[in-house]
Amino acid sequence: MVSCQGTRPCIVNLLTMPSEDKLGEEISTRVINEYSKLKSACRPIIRPSGIREWTILAGVAAINRDGGANKIEILSIATGVKALPDSELQRSEGKILHDCHAEILALRGANTVLLNRIQNYNPSSGDKFIQHNDEIPARFNLKENWELALYISRLPCGDASMSFLNDNCKNDDFIKIEDSDEFQYVDRSVKTILRGRLNFNRRNVVRTKPGRYDSNITLSKSCSDKLLMKQRSSVLNCLNYELFEKPVFLKYIVIPNLEDETKHHLEQSFHTRLPNLDNEIKFLNCLKPFYDDKLDEEDVPGLMCSVKLFMDDFSTEEAILNGVRNGFYTKSSKPLRKHCQSQVSRFAQWELFKKIRPEYEGISYLEFKSRQKKRSQLIIAIKNILSPDGWIPTRTDDVK
């Protein structure tokens, strides 16, 4: 039995649910409960004009297969619907968050949590989630009894949500676009990468983040594409990839109100675009709605993004505006302010990594990344499959 009305709590009878649906419900409840504790600066507002803002919520959870009172542990939660223009990266030096969509921020947050746990790892007492091997320097593994899940309050942008968009838009919402219409492409010579939601009838192509056609282009790829790539390469970023003995993958993605047809399109997008995928994601439904999602046509996307990280014995949260900590943004014609970077930024993660592996002090982030030949070859191979016409990268963003 489910009772959901507007923004009121949703009462769900977990006892009558299949086990996987029950797991999806439990994960969503934990993530939303943590969201409700965020400071008001980290959440959407009612603007002075009376217009209501909305946002997307995501969270990374660790599930203990052995069960127990702490079966589900939240690693990170994040909100956000924004991606910055590619041009912003020319002054970034790793300090600006280019992609502030919730699920990408949540995964960045989980990587920061893992880096923090490795930095504070004590071999004598160990760690709840990770264990080290006997190598020197030691490398780590996620303990076998833990699995990772990603909760997202709505379908990820890009290919995985195109069928839903097609089924739910009005006939006059979008102009009809033919494959020969060149304005839909970021680069007319690369017809396997489309801009945003243009030509939404077309499937199995890479898309940039959605945005107004007259806005400065972001070049950041859709969440569907990024999540799919991580399911072949690992949810670990290049820094944790170096520190872990084996890659780590998502076991579940939890999305509210997943009807059978929508779930089928999700599985088609995630399971067939990359052949022979050994680590297929299971998509779990949940009934509990996210109360700060879009509820009315007049609601507008929230300007603020946020991230909250759950470390070993404390949590920390940040409000993020225009890719930097709230209150630190400067116009693109000016240099960035000191300490503007988020704790999940490339700059902050690189600084943390060098404390763990001081032998990398003195080289840049991109130089370090270029040395990961096996990982680089894998990612290139994935890109070649997803976009046979070629890849359009974002601007270089290095940290010295």
Curated annotation (Swiss-Prot):
GO terms for biological process, alphabetical: tRNA modification; tRNA wobble adenosine to inosine editing
Gene Ontology CC: cytoplasm; nucleus
Annotated positions binding Zn(2+): 101, 157, 223
Active site (catalytic residues): 103 (proton donor)
Protein's UniProt name: tRNA-specific adenosine deaminase 1
Signal peptide range: none
Disulfide bond sites: none
Chain positions recorded as 1D-myo-inositol hexakisphosphate binding sites: 108, 226, 232, 369, 375
High-level lineage: Eukaryota, Fungi, Dikarya, Ascomycota, Saccharomycotina
InterPro entries in the record: A_deamin, Tad1
Any GO molecular function: RNA binding
